[in-house]
Amino acid sequence: MALTLASAADLLKEHHLLREIIQGDVWTDDPARIASADEPFAGITYDTRKVTPGTLLCCKGQFKAEYLNGIDEAGLAAYVAETEYSAATATPGLIVNDARKAMSLLSAAFYGYPQNELTVIGVTGTKGKTTTSYFTQALINAVSGGKVALFSSVDNCLDGHTYVESDLTTPESMDAFRMMREAADNGMKYLVMEVSSQAYKVDRVYGLTFDVAAFLNISPDHISPIEHPTFEDYLYCKRQIIVNAKSLVLGADSLHADLLREDAEAAGIGVTTFALHDADNAGTSADVVAWPADPAHASFHIADGDQALGDYHLSIDGDFNYLNAAAAIAIAHAVGVSLDDADALHAIESVRIAGRMEQFRDPQSNTLAIVDYAHNYASVTALLDFVYERWGEENPRITLVTGSAGNKAYDRRKEIVEAAENRIANFIFTAEDTDTEPIIDICMEMQGYITNKDVVSTVISDRLTAITNAIYDARAHADRFNILLIIGKGNERWIKDHRKHVPFDGDDHVVERMFGL
């Protein structure tokens, strides 16, 4: 059924969001008093630049009346806002208590509730969301004939095989429902999507129920005035995925796992667990368990409780990815994939993710460069654990090329240094989505957290120059095995500076070019 002003008003009333409808001198809660109430909207947007005849505009965030200049001439049909804009437009306004919640509900309705045509899987956690999502897509693709869409912080895939770079970990609600509609129209039957804490903080997934929610892990992150004021708030927002799910897949060793189980019990949903054991298969009991077989070749065992399911080899290095694989297998099982389906389980073996644990060897020196998206204490620690387990006996000289995001997650700056300073030889601090903060200020702040007098540190604001210098420095120490850890950006082809995406080659391309690969 097409969305009209009348049906929009009814939907908003149902969720106790509508305050009144205003058009000129008419203030009412009865849409029948608005002449155009039964005319279907031709489009929906939150960007005034995209208004065309018949469009419903959702005014969210820091919206300003000046954005409405000339909007009636563009064909605006109605608007949704927390403030009336009668002085700027003659069109009717749906005045609401919460514009973001309203936008999510109205977007779902406008696009015909596409989530009802998909099995929707939400993946959350502090680390591992992207890799787990890609593994999950591959597993379910193997049994569904490639019918799995993907929303991730790296790419979006709406047809099972074409990947387009994404802007947000979890898209704005309107974009999410639009893409769900496209995916459903493309014949997709499943959707795997990363769900960030901010998605619940700012209602990007309001009204969306997940068929399966996966809660991988939790550790302090995203603590800042513009994200989460405390860890409690961060965890609380993450936990909302459980309240809005039909079943839960849970990391058995996650911090606060007992609380998460309590949430699931209160919601009346079942729980499937996964865990990573040590090489002797000792660890927390779980429904799906992974443990190392041959770490040098990224091989691991998988078991369904006590029943062995076979050995598998990943194309992505890192013991922590065995845990991500176990999570994906548990998720796939939760949506009906048989754990006896060896072909499906083997589908994870060919998965590669640009900018995640990518390794490059320099033909001119004994240097290994690893490009990864590690950007907080947990992920940097996991990366260094992997490096030491794999190459520790070779006594490598390790250089970390890093920065930290501007205007948010301020604790990361100190935590990255704390995770690395006693395990590496050299820091190079550089740009990483510094936004409106001066690059040099962030780098100098991070440098100031170093307490190990033996570690060398350099500040090089330009990221291209920083990576280039790291490679030249490694070649100058050719008598040692050098490992360059270039983290924070992965394969992203831009750096955020003053709210704009400035084109950048990408860490992987810079390394490939310097190494002549």
Regions found by a protein language model. Give the residues of each.
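ATP-dependent carboxylate-amine ligase
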Residues: 1-22, 51-56, 62-64, 333-340, ...
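N-terminal leader/targeting and accessory segments in enzymes
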Residues: 1-105, 313, 317, 509-517
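Phosphate-binding loop of NTP-binding sites
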Residues: 14, 105-248, 252, 256-270
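Short loop/helix-cap segments at secondary-structure boundaries that form the rim of catalytic
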Residues: 51-52, 70-73, 83-93, 157-161, ...
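A short, gly/pro- and small-residue-rich
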Residues: 66-81, 93-102, 210-218, 232-236, ...
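Short, conserved loop/helix-junction motifs that constitute active-site signature segments
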Residues: 71-75, 206-209, 241-246, 264-267, ...
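Acidic, Mg2+-coordinating active-site environments of NTP-dependent enzymes
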Residues: 87-89, 214-369, 447-451
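Buried hydrophobic packing segments
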Residues: 103-107, 136, 140, 183, ...
